[in-house]
Amino acid sequence: EDYKKSVITEAVTKGLNPDAEMKDSGIEWIGEIPKHWKVLRIKNVGEYRNGLTYKPTDLTDENTGTLVLRSSNIQDGKISLNDNVYVSTFVRSDLKVKKGDILICSRNGSRELVGKNAIIEDLKDVTFGAFMMIFRCNSPKYLYYILNSKVFSYYLGSFFTSTITQLTGSNFGNMKIVYVSDKLEQSKIVSYLDSKCSEIDSLIADKKRQLDILADYKKSLIYEYVTGKKEVPVNE
């Protein structure tokens, strides 16, 4: 996973052309960037919005309520609809998600979960909770990769403390990112990362399967010895 984040970070801060002329970004943890790229605050390339506040008494069932996306609905960088909550309260149109929105966890008891995000695909009449925010922009997949790079991780770490583990709208909007405005270059970076990340995910899944097999074998071996089905060899 750390290697995957490093690959993403390299692509969204250095580009794909190793011979590109570079300049200093002015951001210590980013270093040099391609000369024609810019350093912008993320609020300059899109808009963010905080989620719906609701009470426990607003909870209802699927047939009568509006689905509220929460932190648990983001799994492995994708939207998961296996743990759903519905509310009966009125939801304004500006609090309903649209295709291409980036859903971000902005507050959580676990600081490791703050900042996790996923792109909204085809969801209709769906809102998002108060501990979440959405970011709406013209290049969602490109920005999604920026938000899954070390740039975002370092930024979160710059203001997190032992008592502050939330991403406010102001903090998010003022985050400095490296940005290339050329849509063709954005598209090439996205295509490269789609392919590379798919390859890495396959390797990770394969390693996890191997570890699961070894864990099952270990449990089986322990069971056989503690139940006497196998005996521990004794050296005479």
Task: Label the model's feature ranges.
Residues 1-19, 149, 179-236:
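Amphipathic alpha-helical coiled-coil/heptad-repeat segments
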Residues 21-25, 55-63, 159:
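Short coil/turn segments at secondary-structure boundaries
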Residues 25-52, 174, 179, 183, ...:
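Non-catalytic DNA-recognition/assembly elements of restriction-modification systems
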Residues 43-58, 67, 72-101, 124:
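Sequence-specific dsDNA recognition surfaces
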Residues 75-88, 102-128, 141-145, 153-162:
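Short, ligand-facing micro-motifs at secondary-structure edges
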Residues 125-131, 141, 161-187:
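A short glycine-rich beta-alpha junction/loop motif
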